[in-house]
């Protein structure tokens, strides 16, 4: 596993951890939880598009997807399956853009 793959796996695991933390904290605010999700997804997108020849356009498209993914996860009460679905939704497209 190369460095980029390790970093992607780390970020995906971090996203799982953020969702687990959300479930454990009843008083966790919507704003804070979504900011955390956005930051992790943003790092994942940045990591995967940094070497892409059209990385600015790729990032714009992926950031729109990131917002939708965050809303999807939140609407499904931060369910594990919803979060994994969002990662799978973004990740295959990231690999195609390279």
From Swiss-Prot:
GO cellular-component term (any): host cell mitochondrion
The main location class comes to host cell
Please state where this protein is localized: Host cytoplasm; Host mitochondrion
Alphabetical list of InterPro entries matching this protein: Rotavirus_NSP6
| Superkingdom assignment | Viruses
Q: Is Plastid set as a keyword in this record?
A: no
Pfam families referenced in this protein's UniProt entry, alphabetically:
Rota_NS6
Coiled-coil zones: none
Q: Which UniProt keywords apply?
A: Host cytoplasm, Host mitochondrion
* Keyword hit for Ligase: no
SUBUNIT field = Interacts with NSP2 and NSP5.
According to its UniProt record, which protein family does this protein belong to?
Belongs to the rotavirus A NSP6 family.
Return the protein name. Answer: Non-structural protein 6
Q: Which organism is it from?
A: Rotavirus A (strain RVA/Cow/United States/WC3/1981/G6P7[5]) (RV-A)
């Amino acid at each position: 596993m190369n460095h980029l793959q390790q970093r992607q796996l780390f970020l995906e695991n971090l996203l799982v951890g953020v969702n687990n933390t959300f479930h454990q904290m009843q008083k966790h605010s919507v704003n804070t939880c979504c900011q955390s999700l956005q930051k992790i997804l943003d790092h994942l997108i940045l990591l995967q598009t940094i070497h892409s020849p059209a990385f600015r356009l790729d990032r714009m498209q992926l950031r729109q997807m990131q917002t939708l993914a965050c809303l999807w996860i939140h609407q499904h009460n931060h369910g594990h399956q919803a979060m994994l679905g969002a990662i799978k939704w973004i990740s295959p497209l990231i690999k195609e853009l390279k």
